[in-house]
């Protein structure tokens, strides 16, 4: 049997994290206003603002074998949460502690929004490079500034819809807005020849 990690590990400092504003995008849909929609294929989280607009946040999703879909509600919010890796996660990686206190080194980051009575959360991260990838064990990672912003905008009881992909028409509208902007073309000026 592999060697076990320590029972308690420090998560490090807890600096003040400023809110990072998300991008407002066109989001014509029938999803409930005020609700959260998570598109696992697109690796995006949307906070629906109106029947036609949403705030868009890039996220990290569950890696293969750890992704899921369904409906939940936010049951709790915690700033700089402690992390208690589940036994099966500790079995896969015996170096993990039984508990890591909240802090900048903690994988849950600056804030966690707990989803129902499940072990899943929308949370910050200690690894910003994981955003946009399938890298978690089923949770949804955000940049710390983004999760702080989202937490300030939602309440306990907010509905969360996790979908594999958005409906095709909506997916196209959103994709057209997230494509990188075209590089500006240099202006061409004609030079007159000296006479």
Feature locations, PLM:
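Cell wall/extracellular polymer interaction/catalysis modules
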Residues: 2-81
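General structural signal for secondary-structure boundaries
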Residues: 12, 86-89
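Exported/periplasmic cell-wall-interacting domains
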Residues: 51, 65-66, 70, 82, ...
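Surface-exposed patches in mature extracellular/periplasmic domains of secreted proteins
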Residues: 56-59, 86, 162-163
